[in-house]
Amino acid sequence: MLLSTWTPGCFQGNKILLRSLITWYYLEFMPKLRPFYFLFYLTLPSCATDSPPISDKSSSIFLPLAQQQQLVHWMMPPRFRCQDYLLPLLLALSPAAAAAREVEYHHCHCDGGGGGGGGGLWSMDSIFRWQKVSDLLIAAAYFSIPLEILYFVAGLRHLLPFRWVLVQFGAFIVLCGLTHLLTAFTYEPHPFMVVLLLTTAKFLTALVSFLTAITLLTLIPQLLRVKVRESLLWLKARELDREVVLMKRQEEASWHVRMLTHEIRKSLDRHTVLYTTLIELSRVLGLTNCAVWMPAAGEMCLTHELRRDGGGEDGVVGVDDADVVEVRGSDGVKLLGPDSVLAAASGGKEEGTGAVAAIRMPMLKVSDFKGGTPEVIQTSYAVLVLVPPAGKSWGRHEMEIVEVVAGQVAVALSHATLLEESRAMRDRLAEQNRELLQARRDALMANEARQAFQGVMSQGMRRPIHSILGLVSMVQEEALAPEQRLVVDTMARTATVVSTLVNDVMEMSADSRERFPLETRPFHLHAMIRDAACVARCLCDFRGFGFAVHVENALPDLVVGDERRIFHVLLHMVGNLIGRTEPGHVTLRVRAADDDVLDDRLGQRWDPWWPSYSTGYSSVKFVIGVKRQQNGDAGSPLSRRPSGKGIDLRLSFSMCRKLVQMMQGNIWAILDPQGLPESMTLVLRFQLQSPLTSSSLGGSFEQKHSSPSCQIAGLKVLLIDDDDDINLVVARKLLEKLGCVVSSPPSGSGFLSSVGSSAAAFQLVMVNLEMKRVKALDVATRISQYRSGRWPIVMAMASDQKAWEKCAQSGINGILKKPVILQELKDELARILQST
């Protein structure tokens, strides 16, 4: 039908339909060029403007209405083939078609002749003018479109593979613009050249149009692939968008976790940590309530809650509850059911609340942070319950936030517990330190009291005893009767024992392991027994006891041992026997004992501890017994343990036995049926001393004293002591007894300066190390500065033999231990003079 109506007269009317068909094709398969085609379509001229009107009525530019309807229906795409779209289009075109049919185009201006008819808006002149203006505007628009396409191509270099299509489009648009420009000159009389140019332009336009259409047919598969690629890229973009959303959520969750961790770790108090956790979780997650349940004695107790409503719940849930067991047995977040007791107790049953979540929090112990092998300790778990508002669902990132926060809270609680225990330990250490300081102050006070006691003992007992010993030693040098000498020797030995006891008390200290030091030297055993018997007889006579002594003739005389300690033990045995019984008769028996007897009593073989500078040893047995007058039968031997009646006896006997054991001996007692000591036995082993070496080892009390040697006689001695009591007088008498010329420096403020200058005139300077107002070591050091050659010789007097180390550093030549006895003084002076 379209071909049957295709006449030269209607060519101009049907050309717009062909253009519409081409435009629809491009717009359907090239949607990205729709803006350009839309603009191109708007600028298309109507069929009446492409050529001058034709006067032939049969060659009208409009087709019949039925043919136009069929052509439009065929041209439209399938989705537009509907009567609903076609009817409004025909109604819009019907007025113009009716007006065009009524007008007769009998005026033709091609040659300048013809007349026109009609008037008003629809006159031929007006229509021609409008067509001319429209053609000029269309030409201007067509000429500008290629410039825009070139600018577009310059900005999108990646579209260069389609440059030929763009060039064809540009040529097509330029030719269309040229056609409209030439058409504008055909509304007035014009030469044949204009018609020829117009025909050529239209032919070229048609040719370029068909070439462009053919080129587009080859590009359609590529455009389809681009469409598929666009779909894939769109799907990829959606996936990337989802990943970006997830990343943003993860970043937001990480930020919330960091913020919560920072807030939780601000404090090291357990309660502050828990309340901070509840507040921050509620703020970040928008929760209605939060609660913490702590384990205690087989149940879970509600200890911390964000919102306290004061309800009827008692805040206690059993640890055997199903939800509690499940939550404490899993690592992640668990959503509680609607009938959960734990959720109801945490406020999850109230109106406006959603699904309740819970998670466990491990309560770490302090032992988990200590080194070494970890102990197997059952981990305790607390429960954190989260109550959201109604309609809120738990997302994955929110659960991750809760899990991370629960772990951080567990670590913060463990740190808080560790800090609390550290503070408690610090408080305990501070209390112990205060106790130690108090004990130190008490010890210092006790030491001061002990020193004060020692000072009193030294002033009240030791110094008088030393004076007595010095005087007795002088009396011993006189010509005495045998009975007088016995008494004097006994007094000297007794005073020596008392001095030893006082020294023991004075030198006793808390860190001293050797409370009873031994001084072994050769002595005469017979003389010691005689003196002990003399003192025992005096004690027995004083208490109303009889006394007898039996000494074996084969008993060795010159032995090595500590005669003062042995004398002390014998007197102690006599005192114990006569102090707790009725008056009777005391017997002292001394004999040599076999080694087997001593071995049987000791239960071990004898290991001699003395230096072996003799040929043998001898055991001596001392037996002291008492016989009461009421019964004559002696009791059988009983246990060596003393009775429980006398505490002093037990203490004295234990100390005495310890002293005997130090001398490698043994002592035991035999008690009567009443528990009183009936006899006491002392067994000691002595090293035998040959008479040839007795003089080199110090002699004894019975040694004959020769007259002062020529070196000691006439020796100028300076005696330095700031005390003017009897000790200074006794020391002077002893030196004068030896034939020395004794002088003493004046006391006063210039004592130290006068001593240094005056000491050079003396041969011997004796310094008392126990001076109160002056330091004896400073005096000795000052004297050594004025020494010329070997004179003066400096000798110190001290009660402590250990002071020799300090004296040697101060230039002191020798030390004389107090009490000063005449024979010991003579021996020490002879040794010093011989060595210098």
Curated annotation (Swiss-Prot):
Disruption phenotype: Enhanced ethylene sensitivity and early flowering. InterPro entries: CheY-like_superfamily, GAF, GAF-like_dom_sf, HATPase_C_sf, His_kinase_dom, HisK_dim/P_dom, HisK_dim/P_sf, Sig_transdc_resp-reg_receiver. Cu cation binds at residues 176, 180. Residues 416-452 form a coiled coil. The keyword Lipoprotein does not apply. It is found in: Endoplasmic reticulum membrane. The chain crosses the membrane at residues 137-157, 166-186, 204-224. Keywords: ATP-binding, Coiled coil, Copper, Endoplasmic reticulum, Ethylene signaling pathway, Kinase, Membrane, Metal-binding, Nucleotide-binding, Receptor, Transferase, Transmembrane, Transmembrane helix, Two-component regulatory system. Its EC number is 2.7.13.3. One of its GO terms (molecular function) is phosphorelay sensor kinase activity. Its main location: endoplasmic reticulum. Belongs to the ethylene receptor family. This is Ethylene receptor 3. It comes from Oryza sativa subsp. japonica.
